[in-house]
Regions:
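Cytochrome P450
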Residues: 1-382
């Protein structure tokens, strides 16, 4: 079996049928022909992500679908690209960054997120329906927030949004996009050393080299808006299509039910022979994860295919990963989603799709699943 596998347009939120019913560890041919594994259960996934005998180092891994990796394939990640490192190197970066993503700091951002959402809802109301929710709301909110957090000028948002999208979209020149972003961020880091501000990049200039901070910023910038923007729009699509109201607890259930990382990510390479779910993973073999299937594991979730906004154990999902590489910005993402959904449905309680659900274009081939656009409408006074 190989990835990617398209989802069904009639059931756009369900895992592809070919991935259902697989054993906990199924054989998977990677993009370069390497014969690895696909983990499909929560137990197997937690083992792979939590066992130090599995490595996140990119030079050891084979990818399920073709992606551009900084430094090139089969080469170590450049300094600062912490997502593709193992302890103790990863521990150093993680410790520095954890201090920047404190619960207190994330809470202090909430009023600003609320204001950004309100401003964009005002603009939507002024423009009148229909609007594309992706460009009018879902994309700018996390983009503005991560820009302010990092100290990246939002005036350059068209540039970095385009380059970020190229990194997760097959057919785009990901290598050039990486080069463009690292050049841009490298110059920004150098400016921050001379003229520091009250932002995350400035706060780390005394701890990291220019190269390290450039790649730290690259990860945070791309991950900080690409995933949340897709999740915000796809979550609205799901609620509208399923005819469900938004509830405060719905964020965790939507994260579980939608699983936007859907093409074999994350993945790990075995550093030695390891038994997982009764299968022997040999040293050097790559294990990819099928999060859409894992997050609907019937051994963990009752009636897993049902979208239940009040599900009490939804937070057991792996949308933010597990182990030492668990998402640093997960509290920020949760806040953005909670505030974004709530503000939208409070402002436009009659919100509905402006086109049939089957006509909403899906990102089948992208490594981050979502909708390319989401036409919505609402009742107006006139």
């Amino acid at each position: 079996m190989r990835l990617p596998i398209e989802r069904n347009q009639e059931c756009p939120f369900d895992p592809p049928a070919r991935l259902r019913g697989l054993p906990p560890m199924a054989r998977l041919e990677m993009a370069d022909g390497h014969l690895g594994w696909l983990a499909t259960t929560m137990a197997a996934a937690r083992t792979v992500l939590g066992d130090p005998r599995f490595s996140a180092r990119q030079e050891l891994k084979h990818t399920a679908v073709h992606v551009v990796r900084p430094g090139g394939p089969a080469r170590p990640a450049p300094p600062g690209f912490f997502a593709a490192t193992d302890p103790p190197e990863h521990t150093r970066y993680r410790r520095l960054l954890t201090g920047q993503f404190t619960v207190r700091r994330m809470r202090l951002l909430e009023p600003r997120i609320e204001q950004i959402a309100a401003d964009h809802l005002d603009a939507m109301a002024k423009a009148g329906p229909p609007v594309d929710l992706v460009t009018a709301y879902a994309l700018p909110i996390p983009s503005l927030v991560i820009c302010e957090l990092l100290g990246v000028p939002y005036t350059d948002h068209d540039f970095f949004q385009d380059r970020s999208a190229a990194l997760v979209t097959p057919g785009r020149d990901g290598a050039q996009a990486t080069a463009d972003l690292t050049a841009y961020l490298g110059e920004l880091v150098r400016r921050k050393r001379v003229e520091p501000g009250d932002d995350l990049i400035s706060g780390l200039t005394g701890e990291l080299t220019d190269e390290e901070l450039t790649y730290v910023a690259l990860i945070l910038l791309v991950a900080g808006h690409e995933t949340t923007a897709n999740m915000l729009a796809l979550g609205v699509f799901a609620l509208l299509k399923e005819g469900l109201p938004f509830e405060e607890g719905a964020v965790e259930e939507l994260l579980r039910w939608l699983s936007i990382l859907h093409q074999g990510a994350p993945s790990r390479a075995a550093l030695e022979d390891v038994e997982v779910a009764g299968e022997l993973v040999r040293k050097g073999e790559t294990v990819a994860l099928s999060l859409p299937v894992i997050n609907r594991d019937s051994a963990v979730f009752e009636d897993p295919d049902a979208l239940r906004p009040d599900r009490p154990d939804a937070r057991r999902h792996l949308a933010f990963g597990h182990g030492v590489h668990q998402c640093l910005g997960q509290q920020l993402a949760r806040n953005e989603l909670r505030i974004g959904y709530r503000a939208l449905f409070e402002r436009f309680p009659g919100l509905r799709l402006a086109v049939p659900a089957t006509e909403v274009p899906l990102k089948h081939d992208a490594s981050v699943y979502g909708v390319r656009c989401l036409p919505v409408t609402w009742p107006t006074a006139d």
